[in-house]
Amino acid sequence: MKVRAITEDDSRNYIDLCEKLDQETKFMMLEPDERTITVDEQKNRIQSLLSNENSMIFVAEDNGELVGYLGAYGGNVQRIKHRVHIVVGILQAYTGRGIGTGLFNELEKWSMQVGIQRMELTVMAHNEIGLALYKKMGFSIEGIARDSMFVDGKYVDEYYMAKTLPYARNGNYIYFNE
């Protein structure tokens, strides 16, 4: 298993990964068949993302297949350049193998290099596997968005979670064990 930064050459495989995630889990934003991006559009998005100093996508690769990703999307204005919003997706067949931990460790290494001080995410309140990973990685719940998602005919709450990175203030860095 290899965790690395995304490249433009990953465009087709990244779309395939996202489409698989849309099919197999209800915890992602898009319903199956709502994803309409082309390979060229994805290449442009990746190129644009990589040109932004405070945004990145890390992918987990197994024998040439993308099996997970973590996107970190930073703001463009001065007052929020220190924070990123995170989106994570890992194929169900690969959960419980340390991939999430590996993705977050890469995120934290990168964050230290580019000066990210705060990481934020949302997670559906009933996503126990996601919640466990995020808590393991040091995130805490900061709020609840009531009825913020509509899934399978029901409104679902989301937790707002965040982690403040201490090394951004004092130079220390802590790796998490896989």
Give the location of each predicted region.
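A short beta-loop-alpha structural element at the N-terminal edge
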Residues: 2-16
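Acetyl-CoA-dependent GNAT
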Residues: 8-9, 22, 34-93, 104, ...
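A short, aromatic/hydrophobic, helix- or strand-capping loop or linear motif
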Residues: 26-33
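Conserved beta-strand segments that form the floor/walls of ligand-binding pockets within enzyme
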Residues: 59, 71, 85-89, 118-122, ...
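Conserved active-site alpha-helix within GNAT-family acetyltransferase domains
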Residues: 97, 101, 113, 126-144
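Conserved GNAT acetyl-CoA-binding A-motif
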Residues: 104, 111-122
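Conserved catalytic-core motifs of GNAT/GCN5-like acyltransferases
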Residues: 120-124, 135, 140-156
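Terminal substrate-recognition subdomain of acyl/acetyltransferases
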Residues: 154-178
